[in-house]
From Swiss-Prot:
It is an enzyme of class 6 (ligase). It catalyses: deamido-NAD(+) + NH4(+) + ATP = AMP + diphosphate + NAD(+) + H(+). It holds the Pfam family NAD_synthase. Keywords: ATP-binding, Ligase, Magnesium, Metal-binding, NAD, Nucleotide-binding. It comes from Hyperthermus butylicus (strain DSM 5456 / JCM 9403 / PLM1-5). CDD domains: NAD_synthase. This is NH(3)-dependent NAD(+) synthetase. Mg(2+) binds at residues 45, 148. Catalyzes the ATP-dependent amidation of deamido-NAD to form NAD. Uses ammonia as a nitrogen source. GO terms for cellular component: cytoplasm.
C-alpha cells in the first residue's frame, strides 16, 4: 500500500463546502441562536471558516472579531483580516488585546514565560468571543482544522473553547485547497500557519515538520487504521516522524476530552448510610 498526498486532496470541494454549510445551518438553527461570532486572524483556517459561515447563514448573521495583539500580530495579518471582513460584507470589530493582556501582568505583579503568556492571549480572545456571544445571542464558531485537533495544536480553553468546529473535519492541506475553491485570496490560502502567540512563531517550525507530512501520517493512522510501522512504510516518511505525531496525539488527549470526575456509583452512592 502506498499513500500519497493526492489521495487526501482529490475531492469535490464544492460538495465538501455544501455539506459543511448544511451542517452549519442545521447546528445554528437547532440551537436557537441568532447567528454566530468568529475570530478572524487573517490566516487560512479562520478565513475559510468565515467564507463557509457567510455562504451558510448570510453576512447579516455573522459577527467577526479581529483581535490582534499589537506587540505580536503583524500589520499584514490585521490588514488581511479587515480586508476579508469588508469584502464579505460582515459586521466586524477590531479590538487590540494588548492592554487586556497587560492588565493581567500588572495584576499578577510578575512576568510569565513566553508560552504561558502566549496561551493567555488565546484565552483573552476566547473571553471576548463569548462576551459578544452572550450579549447578542450568538454561537462561537471555532476555526480549528482536523490536523490541529488531532495533534493538540491549540490552546486549551483558548482557541479550543468554541461551540462548534465547521472545518474540524478537514486536514490543513485540504483546508488550503477548499480555500482556493471558495475564492480566498491565494496570499491567505497559502500563508504559513501561525497561532501568533509570540513574535515570529510559525507552526511548522514549532512542530518540526510540514503539515503535508503531518496530514499524511494522521490519514494513515486514523483514517486507514495503520500501525506506526505500516504508516511509515505507506507514506515513505521516517518512523521517527510517525511516532512524533502519535505522541503529540496521545499527549493532547486531555484537550479533546471533558474534565474527568469520580464515578458517583463508586465514589458517592456506595457510601449511602443504611437505615435501621
Amino acid at each position: 500500500m502506498r499513500i500519497t498526498l493526492n489521495e487526501l486532496l482529490d475531492l469535490d470541494y464544492e460538495g465538501v463546502a455544501r455539506s459543511i454549510e448544511e451542517f452549519i445551518k442545521g447546528y445554528v438553527e437547532s440551537s436557537g441562536a441568532k447567528g454566530v461570532v468568529v475570530g478572524l486572524s487573517g490566516g487560512v483556517d479562520s478565513t475559510t471558516t468565515l467564507y463557509l459561515l457567510v455562504r451558510a447563514l448570510g453576512p447579516e448573521r455573522v459577527l467577526v472579531l479581529v483581535m490582534p495583539d499589537s506587540d505580536v500580530t503583524p500589520e499584514e495579518d490585521v490588514h488581511d483580516a479587515v480586508g476579508i471582513a469588508e469584502r464579505l460584507g460582515v459586521r466586524y470589530k477590531l479590538i487590540d488585546i494588548k492592554p487586556i493582556v497587560a492588565s493581567y501582568l500588572v495584576a499578577m505583579g510578575e512576568a510569565p514565560d513566553r508560552r504561558s503568556k502566549g496561551n493567555l492571549r488565546a484565552r483573552v480572545r476566547m473571553t471576548l468571543l463569548y462576551l459578544y456571544a452572550n450579549m447578542e445571542g450568538l454561537l462561537v464558531a471555532g476555526t480549528g482544522d482536523r490536523s490541529e485537533l488531532l495533534i493538540g495544536y491549540f490552546t486549551k480553553y483558548g482557541d479550543g473553547a468554541v461551540d462548534f468546529l465547521p472545518i474540524g473535519c478537514l486536514y490543513k492541506s485540504q483546508v488550503r485547497r477548499l480555500a482556493l475553491h471558495l475564492g480566498v485570496p491565494e496570499k491567505i490560502a497559502l500563508k504559513p500557519s501561525s497561532p501568533r502567540l509570540w513574535p515570529g512563531q510559525l507552526a511548522e517550525d514549532e512542530l518540526g515538520m510540514k503539515y503535508e507530512e503531518i496530514d499524511l501520517i494522521l490519514y494513515a493512522l486514523f483514517d486507514k487504521g495503520l500501525s506506526p510501522e505500516e504508516a511509515a512504510k505507506a507514506t515513505g516518511l521516517p518512523i521517527e516522524k510517525v511516532r512524533r505525531v502519535l505522541e503529540l496525539h496521545r499527549a493532547s488527549e486531555h484537550k479533546r476530552s471533558l474534565p474527568p470526575a469520580p464515578d458517583p456509583a463508586a465514589t458517592v452512592w456506595r457510601f449511602r448510610r443504611r437505615k435501621g
